[in-house]
Amino acid sequence: MNGDEKLGIWLYRTSLVVLVLFFVGFSVVVPIDAMAQASRSTNDALNTFIVVGAFVAFGVLSIIIAVGRVLVQRSCLQDIPKGYLPITPEDMPHQPSRSMILEQMDRSHKLAVLLKKPKEPVTHDGLARPDSDDHGLPPLLNYEDSIKIITSRLKYQGVFSNLVKLDSDTGDTFATIARSMSAQNKLSSSEAAEYIKLYEAIRFSGKEITKEQFLQFMDRSIFFLDSLISTGSIEPRSHRAGDGQKNYSFPPTRAQNTLTTPLQQYVTDYADNESVDTTNIIFPRSPDYALESSSALHYLTTTNTSSTVARKVTPSSYRKDFSGLNETASEEAFRGNNHLKLNDNESYDSVVKRC
């Protein structure tokens, strides 16, 4: 800023101060003079009119000046574009302010280039990534919904596939069911407690489920299922006296495969229906879980598992994978896929280290 600009600014400010002082002085003198003139007059009506009129004129003039200033300022601001930045000396005479604005603009440009595409994969809690995942999770898998489905099947349908008989009330919680199953099958109470603690932390913490928590819960769920299988909780059940039902075992024997069960009949009738979820109907179920209505049968055979991490098996994929296997090969494949070869009372941590 040169000398002429500084002189002009000082003249502008000085003249503004002088005019304001004159305006305030005359505004104060006018009412006082009006009252002094009225006091010398003998006409009371005229005196009252002069005094009241002076105060009213002063108030109206002050309001007009204030409102006019506001309207003029707003009209000037409306003419400025919304995306305009005051970076010129005419708009912002203060040099440090202009320099700060220009520096921040340069910094924003550099950050935009750096942050346009993140270098590391972005993973949000509660949802799987939309692209391929190194852990084999489906794209955009909702962790909370998957855990709800898994725990509901464990509670209402046995261990994922009606493998264990549950004598529980509808109002029992998942923790109660898990403790009851671990006690009935003589599993480690500490393992069951850790499994329940992890479930409650995931479901009731109020925070989004992380990928690590979801994978840990799936590992412990599989370990819990395999522990129940290893303890013999799904060994052949003898029929109860007088119930008129046949013995079943898991996996089914050749004699049981020759029997016609309601589930087998359902699969036969709808063998060409690709929408039928056969995850729960590959093997005949125990008579303890005999279905008493067609609606229950339809629910078990059409329950959607596409939102879980379990593979959805359709009739065509089942025939493609297992049609060429004989009974012995099928049983060996089942044992190889469903058992971790647990030792008696082996803990979850020891299995992880061994694998």
From Swiss-Prot:
Subcellular location: Membrane
Membrane topology, record value: Multi-pass membrane protein
InterPro entries the UniProt entry points to: DLT1
Topological domain spans for side Extracellular: 37-47
Alphabetic keyword roster: Membrane, Transmembrane, Transmembrane helix
Keyword Transmembrane helix carried by entry: yes
Positions of region (Disordered): 236-255
One of the record's GO cellular component terms: membrane
Domain of life: Eukaryota
Main location: membrane
Transmembrane segment boundaries: 16-36, 48-68
Cytoplasmic side: 1-15, 69-355
Bias (Polar residues) ranges: 246-255
Transmembrane helix listed as a keyword: yes
Function field: Required for growth under high-pressure and low-temperature conditions.
Family: Belongs to the DLT1 family.
PANTHER family recorded: DEFECT AT LOW TEMPERATURE PROTEIN 1 (PTHR40021:SF1)
Protein name in UniProt: Defect at low temperature protein 1
